[in-house]
Amino acid sequence: MQTNLLKPKTINVEQLGANRAKVTLEPFERGYGHTLGNALRRVLLSSMVGHAATEVTIAGVLHEYSSIDGVQEDVVNILLNLKGVVFKLHNRDEVTLSLRKDGEGPITAADIQTPHDVEIVNPDHVIMNLSHGGKIDMQIKVENGRGYVPGNVRRYGDESPKSIGRIVLDASFSPVKRVSYTVESARVEQRTDLDKLVLEIETNGAVTAEDAVRASAKILVEQLAVFAQLEGNELGAIINDPAPRSSQQFDPILLRPVDELELTVRSANCLKAENIYYIGDLIQRTENELLKTPNLGRKSLNEIKEVLASRGLTLGMRLESWPPAGLDKR
């Protein structure tokens, strides 16, 4: 009897657009399409290294709820637009860039002054618009990182995060914008119970979809290799000496506000009334607990379950040492 597991022999990459691609792998043993597809999707969304603006200083601006004379957008909208700029740093981990311009007209990412080893992938992206007599002078700190990191949980050593005029941004480092996967039937000779995995990936242009899949697969291999090397004593040490609360690492998805789930206003307000501000708070609630929430009915519950399922999450999950130290519970 054949006991060796099948490995994919056919890999096909189909370009669906400038930053979108469909990657097809087959054949897999039955069930392995979902096993590997979900794992790759989670890694692609949460663990890819990328670059993002993390801090901004604007001349004459003390906080983000300000407006600037001669600039059509307020500071909040400027920061939102700035988050849409895609950076690539070569041979460095962080950089501080300058943006200085005056005169009427739009300001795009191309107006940011960059050294030779910093690349802006979408130079036509509009950051703000100046009116007659308007001018802007700002400093932008760009760092590398993984996933999504809220500004209020990042650490700054001895430097105070409350420095006047220094605006700390929530940073979405991941170059992967969307990932979905489907599992179809595959056939090898007389066997018809095999899986074909189809991954559809969209990136921000900083990496190609193929490179993203390679990088995510490498991360999985490196993580799983540890299990193949486990020894009894080492495993016991891990069990008897759990990581302290301060060093516990959480999936960056769990640190995102529930507002990013794009729920209806009714559902979102019900969650906030129950002090559920982050996705990590939400997934620890059970269906029965949520149904006891005033004004949250079965329709809203189904909406929440569907949105979580699209991100590979469910209700009733348990997280050790939640919430992480420094998380703003508002």
Curated annotation (Swiss-Prot):
Its EC number is 2.7.7.6. Residues 1-231 are annotated as: Alpha N-terminal domain (alpha-NTD). It catalyses: RNA(n) + a ribonucleoside 5'-triphosphate = RNA(n+1) + diphosphate. One of its GO terms (molecular function) is DNA-directed RNA polymerase activity. Residues 250-330 are annotated as: Alpha C-terminal domain (alpha-CTD). InterPro entries: DNA-dir_RNA_pol_insert (IPR011262), DNA-dir_RNA_pol_RpoA/D/Rpb3 (IPR011263), DNA-dir_RpoA (IPR011773), RBP11-like (IPR036603), RNAP_asu_C (IPR011260), RNApol_insert_sf (IPR036643). The keyword Disulfide bond does not apply. SUPFAM superfamilies: C-terminal domain of RNA polymerase alpha subunit, Insert subdomain of RNA polymerase alpha subunit, RBP11-like subunits of RNA polymerase. Keywords: DNA-directed RNA polymerase, Nucleotidyltransferase, Transcription, Transferase. It comes from the Bacteria. GO terms for cellular component: cytoplasm; DNA-directed RNA polymerase complex. It holds the Pfam family RNA_pol_A_CTD. GO terms for biological process: DNA-templated transcription. Gene3D superfamilies: 5' to 3' exonuclease, C-terminal subdomain, DNA-directed RNA polymerase, insert domain, RNA polymerase, RBP11-like subunit. Homodimer. The RNAP catalytic core consists of 2 alpha, 1 beta, 1 beta' and 1 omega subunit. When a sigma factor is associated with the core the holoenzyme is formed, which can initiate transcription. Belongs to the RNA polymerase alpha chain family. DNA-dependent RNA polymerase catalyzes the transcription of DNA into RNA using the four ribonucleoside triphosphates as substrates. This is DNA-directed RNA polymerase subunit alpha.
